[in-house]
Amino acid sequence: MEIKLLITDFDGTLVNTFQANYQAYCEAFQRVGLSLSEDSYRKCYGLRFDDFMDTMGISDSEIRKRIRTLKGECYPSYFGLLKVNTALLDFIRMFRFGGGKTAVASTARGKNLINALTHIGAMDDFDLILAGEDVKQGKPSPEIYNTVISRMGVMAQETLIFEDSNVGLQAAKASGAHYIKITLSSTI
């Protein structure tokens, strides 16, 4: 069956965002009087925000809200640390130029995702962008991939997903689409 849709995850797949996210979270944590070690963040990298906060033992809703807001505000100042997977982005661009459909499906917050895609000059390379708040369940649920496939009007068997994380790969597999694990040499 012909592949008609490419879907890529963002963090760790299309772009190595580890250092940019880590530095932004460090600043946000510091501004609320907390600290974040690189080892602690490494264990949580790729989790949805609420799961990250739960893992870090931060239960106060006001502190969580403040961290989320502060991180969103300072994240763009660390975009210089983003490392684009140029081979994958070039492949996606060629596929789209040839008439294929393309999408980003990420657990990242929509505003942060749009800002980062704009920064790397990739906003126009995707027909659809879905973020964490666009679905009820995070990965490993296939909801985000199933939603993209449905909105793009193709079948799962006509879709190829690029993912890096175990939960993302579980979601890709559960969607019924084809998938490829992406490993960036300097991800984390």
What are these regions (language model features)?
Residues 28, 48-61, 116, 148-149:
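Helix-loop "lid/cap" segments that line or gate small-molecule binding pockets
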Residues 20, 44-48, 70, 83-87, ...:
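Short beta->alpha linker loops
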Residues 1-4, 89, 93-96, 109-188:
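Asp-based, Mg2+/Mn2+-dependent phosphohydrolase catalytic module
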Residues 35, 101, 178:
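Residue-level detector of anion-binding/catalytic polar loops
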Residues 34-36, 58, 122, 153-154:
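Helix N-cap/coil-helix junction residues
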Residues 1-42, 174-175:
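Active-site neighborhood of HAD-like aspartate-dependent phosphohydrolases
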Residues 13, 106-108:
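Conserved phosphate-coupling serine/threonine residues in phosphotransfer and NTP-handling enzymes
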Residues 54-93, 98-100:
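Metal-dependent phosphoesterase signature
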